[in-house]
């Protein structure tokens, strides 16, 4: 069983912002596998389904980004999911737009949502899909809560689809295979 968590902030004002990339990827997976994310529990919205023979729980925390660990730990404990089977999808400023990076473990890299998850799980050993949003020329908060330009949106839509495939690959083939397949790929207009 896998817990697939997309990080983001709830509310219409955050829809399609850089910081909500995790929510967008989870929505793509939900659509592909006909999973309705319409249940409220674990301080978030979630739905259950399958990818092949694997049961998956799709979770969108409603705690706001910096407290995402509260939602993740509740769902992981309820379903008794191993940390190695918790996949977290989130935006990453240290990666260029058009790229993603799959990792099996690691530090928060300055991302407060991941930092909070690491604190609550008491571990940094969980797979993640880091979706590049590029470096800001402006205030970081304004940047991550801002929306992509039209040109960037074209690239991001393709990266979101690739990120969903990377998550599915982790479930079906394992982290190493997903890393080999998706790390280093760059999407351009």
UniProtKB/Swiss-Prot annotation:
Could you give a single Gene Ontology term from the biological process aspect? protein quality control for misfolded or incompletely synthesized proteins
Enumerate the catalysed reactions. Answer: an N-acyl-L-alpha-aminoacyl-tRNA + H2O = an N-acyl-L-amino acid + a tRNA + H(+)
Enzyme active site: 19 (proton acceptor)
Q: Pfam families this protein is in?
A: Pept_tRNA_hydro (PF01195)
Which UniProt keywords are given for this protein, alphabetically ordered? Cytoplasm, Hydrolase, RNA-binding, tRNA-binding
Report a single Gene Ontology molecular function: tRNA binding
What's the EC number here? 3.1.1.29
Sites where the protein binds tRNA:
14, 64, 66, 112
Gene Ontology cellular component terms for the protein in this record: cytoplasm
Q: Give the highest taxon in the source lineage.
A: Bacteria
Tell me where it resides.
Answer: Cytoplasm
Per the UniProt record, the site (Discriminates between blocked and unblocked aminoacyl-tRNA) maps to 9
Site annotation Stabilizes the basic form of H active site to accept a proton: residues:
91
**Database matches in NCBIfam families:** pth
Q: Fill in the subunit field for this protein.
A: Monomer.
Name recorded for this polypeptide: Peptidyl-tRNA hydrolase
Q: State the gene name recorded for this protein.
A: pth
């Amino acid at each position: 069983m896998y817990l697939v968590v997309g990080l983001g902030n709830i509310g219409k004002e955050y829809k399609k912002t850089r910081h909500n990339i995790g929510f967008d990827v989870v929505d793509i997976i939900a659509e592909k596998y006909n999973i309705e994310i319409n249940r409220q529990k674990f301080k978030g919205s979630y739905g259950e389904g399958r990818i092949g023979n694997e049961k998956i729980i799709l979770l969108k925390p409603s705690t706001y980004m910096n407290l995402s660990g509260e939602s993740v730990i509740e769902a992981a404990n309820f379903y008794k999911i191993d940390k190695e089977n918790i996949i977290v999808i989130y935006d990453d400023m240290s990666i260029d737009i058009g790229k993603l990076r799959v990792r099996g473990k690691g530090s928060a890299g300055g991302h407060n949502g991941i930092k909070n998850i690491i604190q609550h799980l008491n571990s940094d050993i969980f797979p993640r899909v880091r979706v590049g949003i590029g470096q800001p020329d402006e205030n970081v908060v304004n940047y991550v809560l801002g929306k992509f330009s039209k040109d960037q949106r074209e690239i991001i839509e393709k990266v979101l689809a690739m990120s969903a495939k990377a998550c599915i690959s982790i479930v079906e083939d394992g982290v190493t295979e997903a890393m080999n397949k998706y790390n280093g790929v760059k999407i351009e207009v």
